[in-house]
C-alpha cells in the first residue's frame, strides 16, 4: 500500500482537525517505518511526533477501523511546535509548579539546554544551544547536569500530552514560566525551536560553567562570552540564583541542609543562596553583598560579582534597584533561551492572550493595600445599590460605613492578605 505524501501534507497544513497521540520511541537513531496493507487509506487516526524523527517531519499513524492494525509514515510538518498546544502546556506547567514546587530545577533545565551554545561554530546542531539535546542520556550524564533527570521526569508527561511541542520549546517554556510564577518578570519568549534527533548530536562535555574555578571572573567570561553574552548579562543571569539550592551530592557544593531548607512542602535539604529561595527578587545580590548568614550559600563565582570591577557595577545596581534587575534579567533570559536554536518557522512563534498567570506563593511583607482596580470595583458595586463616597445610602449612614469597612477587610483578606506558605524545590 502507498499513501500520497503530498495529500498527507495538505491534510496536516489545512484547517482539518487531527487528533494527537505520542509515538513509540526507541533507542535506535534510525526510524523504522511499518506499513500494513490492511490499513484503510481513509482511516487516519492520529498524528504523533517522536525523538526518532527530525522536527521537519510528523509520524502519521493510520488505524484500521475494525482490526486496529496501524500504518506509520513520514510526512512534512508545518512548524516545530503548535501555538495552541504551547498555550495549554503553559497552564499545565503552572499547575505542576503549584503542586511540585519545582521552579529551580525547571529554570536549570532550560538554562543547561541552551548554555552549551558556541558562537564560533555556525553549523546546527554542532553549535549547541537550545535544541532539546538534554533529553538524551549522553548529555544528562555530564557532571554539570547532575540531578536534571528529575526535571526530565517532570516534563515527559507534558511532552506525551502535547506531542506537537518540541522538547527544546518545552524546556524553555517551563524555564520562563517558572521565573514568572515565582514572582519574577515576564519573559519575552518566542517558540518554534527544532529538536535534535539523536544522542550523537549532543555537545561535548565542558561547555557549562563551574562553580569554583581558580579564576572565577575569568571563567565566567570565558564561558558566557563564548555564548555571545556580555558582563551585564552575566550578572543579571547570575541573579536567578535567588531561586533554588545547591546539593553536595549533585554539585559538590553547599551544606546537606540548613535552617532554611530542612523542612518544606517538597524534598528537603541543600543550601540556598537566599532565605526565601523560591521567590524571585533581588535578594541574591543583597545577601552576597552583606554576607550576613553562614546558612546562605556564596560560591566563588557568586563572590566574583562583587569583586570584579565591571561585574560589581551591575551587582551593586541590582542590589538597590529590583526594577532594573527585572528588566535586564528578562532580556538576558530571553536571549539565552534563543541561543543556537533553529526556528521553524524562522521568525518563531509568539504566544498571545495567555491567561493571567498564577502566583505560586506570597511571602509576608506586612500590611497590603487594595489595588486600584479592586477599589474601583468596590466603588462600582457600592454605587450600584445607590451609595457613593459623596452620597451615602439614605437608610442608615453609620450602618453603611460599617458594611463598607467590613467588605474592604474581607476583600483585603481574600486578595491581599498575608500568606506565609513557603516553596520547596529539588
From Swiss-Prot:
Biased composition (Basic and acidic residues): 246-260
Pfam families in alphabetical order: peroxidase
Active site, per annotation: 112 (proton acceptor)
Other known facts: Binds one cation per subunit; probably K(+), but might also be Ca(2+).
Protein name per Swiss-Prot or TrEMBL: L-ascorbate peroxidase T, chloroplastic
Keyword field contains Membrane: yes
Gene Ontology MF annotations: heme binding; L-ascorbate peroxidase activity; metal ion binding
Gene that encodes the chain: APXT
Family stated for the protein in its record: Belongs to the peroxidase family. Ascorbate peroxidase subfamily.
Amino acid at each position: 500500500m502507498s499513501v500520497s505524501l503530498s495529500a498527507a501534507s495538505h491534510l496536516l497544513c489545512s484547517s482539518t482537525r487531527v487528533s494527537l497521540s505520542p509515538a513509540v520511541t526507541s533507542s535506535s537513531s534510525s526510524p523504522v517505518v511499518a506499513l500494513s496493507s490492511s490499513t484503510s487509506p481513509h482511516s487516519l487516526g492520529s498524528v504523533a511526533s517522536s525523538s526518532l524523527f527530525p522536527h521537519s517531519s510528523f509520524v502519521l499513524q493510520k488505524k484500521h477501523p475494525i482490526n486496529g492494525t496501524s500504518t506509520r509514515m513520514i510526512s512534512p510538518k508545518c512548524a516545530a511546535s503548535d501555538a495552541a498546544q504551547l498555550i495549554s502546556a503553559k497552564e499545565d506547567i503552572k499547575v505542576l509548579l503549584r503542586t511540585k514546587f519545582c521552579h529551580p530545577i525547571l529554570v536549570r533545565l532550560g538554562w543547561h539546554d541552551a548554555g552549551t551554545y558556541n558562537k564560533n561554530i555556525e553549523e546546527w546542531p554542532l553549535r549547541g544551544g537550545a535544541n532539546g539535546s538534554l533529553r538524551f542520556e549522553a548529555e544528562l550524564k555530564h557532571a554539570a547536569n547532575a540531578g536534571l533527570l528529575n526535571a526530565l521526569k517532570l516534563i515527559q508527561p507534558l511532552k506525551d500530552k502535547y506531542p506537537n511541542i518540541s522538547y527544546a520549546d518545552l524546556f524553555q517554556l517551563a524555564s520562563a514560566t517558572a521565573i514568572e510564577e515565582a514572582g519574577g518578570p515576564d519573559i519575552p519568549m518566542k517558540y518554534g525551536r527544532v529538536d535534535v534527533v539523536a544522542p550523537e548530536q549532543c555537545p561535548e562535555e565542558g561547555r557549562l560553567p563551574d562553580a569554583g574555578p581558580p579564576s572565577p571572573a575569568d571563567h565566567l567570561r570565558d564561558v558566557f562570552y563564548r555564548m555571545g553574552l556580555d558582563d551585564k548579562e552575566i550578572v543579571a543571569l547570575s541573579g536567578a540564583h535567588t531561586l533554588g539550592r545547591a546539593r553536595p551530592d549533585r554539585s559538590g557544593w553547599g551544606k546537606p541542609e540548613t535552617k532554611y531548607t530542612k523542612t518544606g512542602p517538597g524534598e528537603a535539604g541543600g543550601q540556598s543562596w537566599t532565605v526565601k529561595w523560591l521567590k524571585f527578587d533581588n535578594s541574591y545580590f543583597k545577601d552576597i553583598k552583606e554576607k550576613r548568614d553562614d546558612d546562605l550559600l556564596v560560591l566563588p563565582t557568586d563572590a566574583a560579582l562583587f569583586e570584579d570591577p565591571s561585574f560589581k557595577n551591575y551587582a551593586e545596581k541590582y542590589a538597590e534597584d529590583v526594577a532594573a534587575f527585572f528588566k535586564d534579567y528578562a532580556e538576558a533570559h530571553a536571549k539565552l533561551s534563543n541561543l543556537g536554536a533553529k526556528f521553524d518557522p524562522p521568525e518563531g512563534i509568539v504566544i498571545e492572550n495567555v491567561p493571567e498567570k498564577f502566583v505560586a506563593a506570597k511571602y509576608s511583607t506586612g500590611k497590603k493595600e487594595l489595588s486600584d482596580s479592586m477599589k474601583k470595583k468596590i466603588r462600582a458595586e457600592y454605587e450600584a445599590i445607590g451609595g457613593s463616597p459623596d452620597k451615602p445610602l439614605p437608610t442608615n449612614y453609620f450602618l453603611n460605613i460599617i458594611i463598607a469597612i467590613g467588605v474592604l477587610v474581607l476583600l483585603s483578606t481574600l486578595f491581599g492578605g498575608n500568606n506565609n506558605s513557603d516553596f520547596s524545590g529539588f
